Amino acid sequence: PNFGGYKLDLNGNLKISTTVAKGVELNEKVAELKEQGYITSVTTNSRGVTTVTYKVSMDDGVESTQVISLGDLQKAAINICNFIMNSIEFANANDLEAKSLNELYADALQTITSYEKDDVVPSTTYSTITEGYDWGPAISKVVVNVGKAMSGNIDASAFEVNVTRKALNGFLLGPSRGTRNVTAAYVSDANGNKAATGNYITLELEVGPDLSIGSPFNYNFFGSGHNEYVDTAYEVTLNKELKAADGSSVNFAANKFAADTTWICDDFDLDGKFSYNDEKFGQIALTYASYTPEAAKNDGKKNALIIWLHGAGEGGTDPRVALLGNKVVNLATDTVQQYFDGGAYVLAAQCPTMWMDNGSGQYTSDGTSKYTAALMELIKAYVNSNSDIDASRVYIGGCSNGGFMTMNMIVHYPKYFAAAYPVCEAYTNDALTDEMVESIKDMPIWFTHAKNDPTVKIGTIDEDGNFVSNGNYSPKAYERLTEAGGSDIHFSLFDDVHDTTGLYKRADGTPYQYNGHWSWLYTLNNECKENIDGEEVTIWQWISTKSKTNRGLEKVIAKVNALNAEDYTADSWAAVQSALAAAKAVAADQNATRTQINAAMEELVADRAEDPGTAG
């Protein structure tokens, strides 16, 4: 049962026949094996073709983690026969040779397909479930079609799950084959949902930031420079007895792929395509994924739009990569959606190269991007085609390359966006002119970065353990905007990027450390927080309150917040505080009308009159 290091996938005893051509002598080993019972018969037909029938048992002590099914062996043998029949040598053979070869082929084909079918492990289908994690996507579950009704508890140790991964383009980084650890097993429906009875068994698989064997992605380092899907094949086999609900034995080799379900990602429209004819760069094609909140369809109100711009590794033409490479799917979960009345639309735009492409195919050195106009036209087209979107509440952000593009878009179109959230942004300080700073200082902006970012480096740690900025990127942009008078500019600066779930740890028990460039995890997990007006506010809670319509009101609120009580009488200060509280409530109301906003602003201005009265 050992075929080149592979274990033949059999169940119990099975007879296999081998055809031996006329004139080939059998050695004494055949007689020896026949005497031992491994060979059950040796027969020769009228044409001199000998058939040797073997009895194969899997109790022969063959140790191998790699399994090949009998069906695969048959297919391979048939393919070899077909190759011989179609070869030039065969075509050039004389009639007599061709006739004998034809006869031999017929005999071989017959013996290849003549086996005891009832004893063969039945092949069945499986489906996979993919989820987005902090480190990227992973296949977390395999759903096996057992073909029989199952019930009760399922022993997870009864299953062996093997996987092979093949890069469709370029070299594969990481393992090409391996075994997945099964952490749980249960009866389910076809979608992997637990069930009391059902014809399916779902296997939960171990996942983690270092278990790349479970990833459907490969980073094409030597090619596109993007994350790309790999060809993934699973095989699930049994290593223990399994009983169906009726008590009958269950056996299978699940090796026929049926479908993949990618949680949350499948809730997006993944077919977005947009074309733009740029005056300088010619025809530009963009792809995109978009999400429509279910509640927004019939709530009778306009809803916000969140725009995400991917990093360099998520470019290309497959929007799934842009959603899963950086856990952007979280924008469609309650983690973010809970703050938006009726939910928020999500637009994840994707460029074929990288946002920092200045038209040469290389990284920009002057802060320009060939995609600037094309992206703006895509955004406008998407907003215009969805009448339910509130054009005064369009928020733009992204990470790394996408952080660069976020800055690029707001300095080119400062009046279009209600707020921005650049993460580990790569827009250099040299490219950010004073005029640009002046144009966006009144826009609400929340920066995020990690001190130990090795890609977009923002500083160093001195000998005393203090962070020293290098005067570039997020820290410098934040500094310049606040010094210019920006009153709603925020910055979450983290020491590092580490696991916050408690699930993944280092050998010493401390949280698993991700690459310091990955500060987008804090943004997408809503873990950026700041104390604003005495209240701890998260980044998405903050973004959800921003609107171009109430930006004037927010500026007045900021000025009133800076007033001092000692400059007012007790009564006048109480009036100011009352008007301030009312104004804040209006500013936070996502459905506030222009009339309500103007009234709140007038009341606040009136109560903070030039002559505040006599202090006391």
Regions of interest found by a model, annotated:
Residues 117-143, 163-303, 477:
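A domain-start/cap signature at the N-terminus of enzymes
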